[in-house]
């Protein structure tokens, strides 16, 4: 089972997005995307929704609750 950071990175790469591109879509810094992808910290609930929207998946998919 993938962790949240690995899921974010995998989905980002599948969409062909760079960290700066995803950061702009979500409204955070480039560094924050790196922090999340490396499991240093997890995004707040409000950013989970923005990530899900940017990556075109549900929050449940991000959290590994559904495939």
Regions found by a protein language model. Give the residues of each.
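A short, Lys/Arg-rich alpha-helix, primarily the initiator
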Residues: 1-14
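Residue-level signal for the short linker/turn that defines the boundary of a DNA-recognition helix
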Residues: 6, 16-17, 43-46
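Short alpha-helical DNA-recognition segment
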Residues: 16-35
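DNA major-groove recognition helix of helix-turn-helix
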Residues: 37, 55, 63-66
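DNA major-groove recognition helix of helix-turn-helix/homeodomain DNA-binding modules
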Residues: 44-61
